[in-house]
Amino acid sequence: LPTHETLPADHKAAIRQMKQALRAQIGDVQAVFDKLSARISERLQEIETLKAAGQEVWPTIPFRDIAEGTVSDEQRAAIKRRGCAVIKGHFPREQALAWDTAMLEYLDRNHFDDVYKGPGDSFFGSLEASRPEIYPIYWSPSQMQARQSDEMAAVQSFLNRLWRFEQNGKRWFDPDVSVIYPDRIRRRPPGTTSKGLGAHTDSGALERWLLPAYQQVFANVFNGNIDAYDPWDAAHRTEVEEYTVDNTTKCSVFRTFQGWT
């Protein structure tokens, strides 16, 4: 396949060439697409049935069960089926409220309302300029204390271990070692209806089409064997290096999950 380690000068032509090669490799593209569409429809119906019955759609895991190692195989399977989870009791309520208060004091102390000029990228362009729901603040004491807590490390290790991170003698990442990932503050006042985030897919689309590592990650998709594709297989994901382009929001870190605390 015509992969590219660096971004080609005419990346649009390169993607067209890749798509032609993939179509030839897959064969009956429509049949594969129809099969996947039917599978997605079945999953959506499953979710709608649960919602109508007032049952839980995404799994909720008490932090205590993670700390004590009592999360069941059924709960782990539910997280992998949904691709997300809610962890409750991660921090005491009093601690969370204290961090929230300290964060507001940090904003006031640094004159946030006077110096804030907008989100700085297109993901949050629809938010209000003053006191937004998502703040471009990364290193406040509240954020750092949460990131560096033992509780956070325990949850990250638990979630990382849901991935298939080692196979054939190769370890793709260490599930018990996480890099502190700085991200914004999200603070939604009661009654907020805005989702705060524009629709987007993290990591570059160019790379998904053209990088050799991504061709390995999605090999079973690109050869039409979608039944063999395991989205929890970390193989080759840590080999992905995004192209050097003028983009302020890119990052080479492999994030096993993304969440809000």
What are these regions (language model features)?
Residues 1-81:
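Fe(II)/2-oxoglutarate
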Residues 54, 74, 79-82, 91-261:
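Non-heme Fe(II) oxygenase catalytic core, chiefly the N-lobe of the double-stranded beta-helix
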